[in-house]
Amino acid sequence: MKNNDKLDSHTPMMQQYLRLKAQHPEILLFYRMGDFYELFYSDAKRASQLLDISLTKRGASAGEPIPMAGVPYHSIENYLAKLVQLGESAAICEQIGDPATSKGPVERKVVRIVTPGTISDEALLQERQDNLLAAIWQDAKGFGYATLDISSGRFRVAEPADLETMAAELQRTNPAELLYPENFEPMSLIEHRHGLRRRPLWEFELDTAKQQLNLQFGTRDLIGFGVEQAHLALRAAGCLLQYVKDTQRTSLPHIRGLTMERQQDGIIMDAATRRNLELTQNLSGGSENTLAAILDCSVTPMGSRMLKRWLHMPIRDIRVLTDRQQAIGGLQDIAAELQTPLRQVGDLERILARLALRTARPRDLARMRHAFQQLPEIHRLLQPIDVPHVQNLLSQVGQFDELQDLLERAIVETPPVLVRDGGVIASGYNAELDEWRALADGATDYLDRLEIREREKLGLDTLKVGFNGVHGYYIQVSRGQSHLVPIHYVRRQTLKNAERYIIPELKEYEDKVLTSKGKALAIEKGLYEEIFDLLLPHLPELQLSANALAELDVLANLAERAETLNYSCPTLSDKPGIKIMGGRHPVVEQVLKEPFISNPLTLSPQRRMLIITGPNMGGKSTYMRQTALIVLLAHLGSYVPADQATIGPIDRIFTRVGAADDLASGRSTFMVEMTETANILHNATEQSLVLMDEIGRGTSTYDGLSLAWACAENLASRIKAMTLFATHYFELTTLPEKMEGVANVHLDALEHGETIAFMHSVQEGAASKSYGLAVAALAGVPRDVIKRARQKLKELESLSNNAAASTIDGSQMTLLNEEIPPAVEALEALDPDSLSPRQALEWIYRLKNMV
């Protein structure tokens, strides 16, 4: 539609539509017309593409045909779910006027705005996953970041100091919708995300943000939340809260405070580490064979979501971790028994959010009632458990006898989906409702009596009384007897073989019945809203209870997993180091068909770095990752897959494991590898756990070995981080002779003829040889290629043995007798087929400068 179209050139209905659309220019407007929601103009074209619905035309307005698309009102939720998954938003416009009394178009207004980050309807949400709305702010001092889960009221803020930390936060929280200011500079950080919303700068104004937040929480200042001076975070939080108020168009009583998340409270993991450890998402983007897939057998959706939050935010507070360990130990004997009533509790957290937003449906209230009915059994099971943390959680669970009684009296056993058609409020709850219902429900008896009376009085055996939606109540007589009806019978409808009549008595009763049905429905809707008013004052205790029930679910789940998977309770020490006896990889051991070979690990201030050698497929990466996962699980408070484990203080986990070309950002494998390595060397500390796998393999041997050597040296002598350093460069196995705190370990294999058996067991000392050719044969490389490779290997080995510089130290790292010129080295490493024309031109200039 052209901007200069005048409103008055359109029909009255289209004028109404265009006024409403002008208030929501950037989102799809679903405009209720009878039994359909219609979309017009550009909205119709977009919706037809996004939702795969027909694009038609509706007459003409202002002299032009109007593009139109529509969806039936009863299936709107399915279409909204699809839009939300695509990161789109929609405004829902309803008819609020009465068509019977309206002059001109029926009055309509937008009653809700559905956006990916503000949905609370269970049909639109993924049950076992948090759905977050986030806002981001950035200036010279760093970033401000706020997240809100509207389906629980959980409001968090943080102030990431730099781009890498901000990227890690975005990956950890994975918001469904992200608000950002119009002058946001590092767009590369967010541009690949769904659900981006550009907001004007004034929405991030600091004083307005403080005012909005104090108003929401009913406080004079934000000191009690520890965020008064967090100006960057508050700007983001203010914009986020305003956006939620604008879209929800209702009060938000379940959002009662906000929490500042500080990096030092948890173990810091960057985006690469989270990806490499496959916590909740595997490297292919799925959820199979992840740590969560093995660990999450929670019986409530809210417990499952909490466990995933724990996985992504391991904590360092020994007191909290010890509480969790003791609770898991205390629950092991009753875990299965406790999970039975917990399973019946369901998703109380999200039901309470819908209650707060006054969008809870009748079945939500029935589920809440069912949850309350489980609490006595949960109390019975947990009261004998003599663990302080369990008893503390039990006191938070509480009992809600009065609310349970209210819902048992007020709501029918199996309520309908919507309150719209009535039948939700139970008989006996309200005397006036029962009277009006009796009138409406008494219609059947009355009609039966009327039919018998009239048939006998008039002697017409074909006479019967009925009802249809168009003509209401009627008396029907066959065509053959219609001449016998009395004069006060007024003809209402003629059929092929019968006539239908109305009499004053029946008309009077019809009016009374229809009035009583309407009256009963109005009373019922009023009572339903009244139940909300009776429940809402208890919202804080109910939210506390839901949170405690979710944590009990997580702890019972971890207790069951520990028992089933043979995990042990780790010791959390304040002395630096990691000592693991019989450690296993929690995911690989479940996927493997043969028994998993467990392995020990010792890291300490005197043994800070392990140089790990051994064949490809020998288990180096598995050994490294299992160490990180055991450390991470220990900082959940969980038991760990090991015979015994003692874990000292850890501040960060870094992984440089495997890489693929980051084509979207135009970065090669080697560039990705070096970027991640630089991040580690800049940010690791003495208390960090660092996994380095095959550093330098993305470039030439000469460069690669130099880089690997320098990185290992730096980590061991300057940073002194606890490091697992897997490598194929056997020259690195001489490092322990030159530096203190470095040791060699290797994974063994046995070669028999042309076959190879991987032992998967970690031994002290360096590997005696590489098994690259045996692995190549195993992978199906043709035998003649393997044979030629063996010949070449012998030639190279003899050349290497004759070389003058056969040993390496930090000052001289010559691999061959003569140094290869850099230009030749670069050319050898170059793959011409992978270069774009522009990259090829750049390389010509680069090589020219090298010569």
Curated annotation (Swiss-Prot):
Which positions are annotated as binding ATP?
614-621
Q: Does the keyword Nucleus apply?
A: no
Instruction: Note whether DNA damage occurs among the keywords.
Output: yes
Task: Write the signal peptide boundaries.
Answer: none
Q: Which UniProt keywords apply?
A: ATP-binding, DNA damage, DNA repair, DNA-binding, Nucleotide-binding
Which residue windows are transmembrane per the record? none
> Can you tell which superkingdom this protein's organism belongs to?
Bacteria
Which Gene Ontology molecular-function terms are recorded?
ATP binding; ATP-dependent DNA damage sensor activity; damaged DNA binding; mismatched DNA binding
Function, as annotated, reads: This protein is involved in the repair of mismatches in DNA. It is possible that it carries out the mismatch recognition step. This protein has a weak ATPase activity.
- Descriptive protein name: DNA mismatch repair protein MutS
**In which organism is this protein found?**
Yersinia pseudotuberculosis serotype O:1b (strain IP 31758)
Its taxonomic placement starts with:
Bacteria, Pseudomonadati, Pseudomonadota, Gammaproteobacteria, Enterobacterales
